[in-house]
Amino acid sequence: MIKLCREVWIEVNLDAVKKNLRAIRRHIPHKSKIMAVVKANGYGHGSIEVARHALEHGASELAVASVEEGIVLRKAGITAPILVLGFTSLSCVKKSAAWNITLSAFQVDWMKEANEILEKEASANRLAIHINVDTGMGRLGVRTKEELLEVVKALKASKFLRWTGIFTHFSTADEPDTTLTKLQHEKFISFLSFLKKQGIELPTVHMCNTAAAIAFPEFSADMIRLGIGLYGLYPSAYIKQLNLVKLEPALSLKARIAYVKTMRTEPRTVSYGATYIAEPNEVIATLPIGYADGYSRALSNRGFVLHRGKRVPVAGRVTMDMIMVSLGENGEGKQGDEVVIYGKQKGAEISVDEVAEMLNTINYEVVSTLSRRIPRFYIRDGEIFKVSTPVLYV
């Protein structure tokens, strides 16, 4: 057993990742490929190991948010196509080509300048480009057919750029009202038809995120982008209630009790601000996790953890590196007891979705903000096979 200096860790069940991939694979058309989205350190799960496992079990391409995230994967020996979904400045064009990382782009001037940069550098690699079409997200992308045609012409005229994909992004595919999703789909298809009428052969076409892939598998086109669903989390309660695909959460967050005390003497205040006052003989346990680890300060006096299969409340304010929980009056607990912060223990569960609802946010934020300083234990075939951590362990 690995002994951590600071006993808090994340368990990532790669068997669950495999199940989720296969569940989506069965749900979408056979011809549609799967792009595994591993941005934000794999939504907090760890991008390298999730990417490797996804590629082993059905994904053919990867997506990230930045060139830097892509380079991390390349340095780990991953050779599959990697698409940067976000905007990339021209200063990173040369680097992207050198590392064979595909960029999303949508501006004629950007295309021309990128080509000039690579021409001056006599780049040995042509830079792959996916054109981003804005059909209703209002974030990035071309917005008119005429604009799209000019971008395509600039791209096809370039000697150092190559066109390998075109995509859009649905903004409300996770909601019960499907009006905008269908409108976006119609608009995107009309853009593609417009290009075809110009005699332009289309590269890989993709539009579905997890929500759209589940709710509208007929929109899957050449490829879908599987993000939150890869990790066993649903994009929304609505998508989960459709009961079309069964997903299994891959992440658990755990810790061991660092210290236990019975609050027999005054003052019985707990944590900053003295917002919690313990009862006589109340047992308070300290856990080595705080808001610097991604456990939100908004859970102060509100959150719960699992101890010996029972829910126990957070006592007082969440601090940067530690929280305190109440084991109750004359409660039982000892240093070294395992506590589950997100996940299951003896039939009880605190789900990421529950925590997200408590915080008035979404599950994406809860997992993606988990700090890199927390060790990740990767589980495969029911056993821990790798530990990824910046913290020394013996």
UniProtKB/Swiss-Prot annotation:
EC primary class: isomerase
SUPFAM superfamilies reported in the protein's UniProt record: Alanine racemase C-terminal domain-like, PLP-binding barrel
Matches recorded under Gene3D superfamilies: Alanine racemase, Lyase, Ornithine Decarboxylase, Chain A, domain 1
Pathway recorded for this protein: Amino-acid biosynthesis; D-alanine biosynthesis; D-alanine from L-alanine: step 1/1
Residue ranges the record marks as coiled coil: none
Disulfide bond sites: none
Gene Ontology terms for molecular function: alanine racemase activity; pyridoxal phosphate binding
Keywords from the named record: Isomerase, Pyridoxal phosphate
Positions annotated as active site in the UniProt record: 39 (proton acceptor), 272 (proton acceptor)
Binding site for substrate: 139, 320
Swiss-Prot/TrEMBL catalytic activity: L-alanine = D-alanine
Alphabetical list of Pfam families matching this protein: Ala_racemase_C, Ala_racemase_N
Keyword Isomerase tagged: yes
InterPro entries: Ala_racemase (IPR000821), Ala_racemase/Decarboxylase_C (IPR009006), Ala_racemase_C (IPR011079), Ala_racemase_N (IPR001608), Ala_racemase_pyridoxalP-BS (IPR020622), PLP-binding_barrel (IPR029066)
Membership in a protein family: Belongs to the alanine racemase family.
NCBIfam families: alr
Protein name, per record: Alanine racemase 2
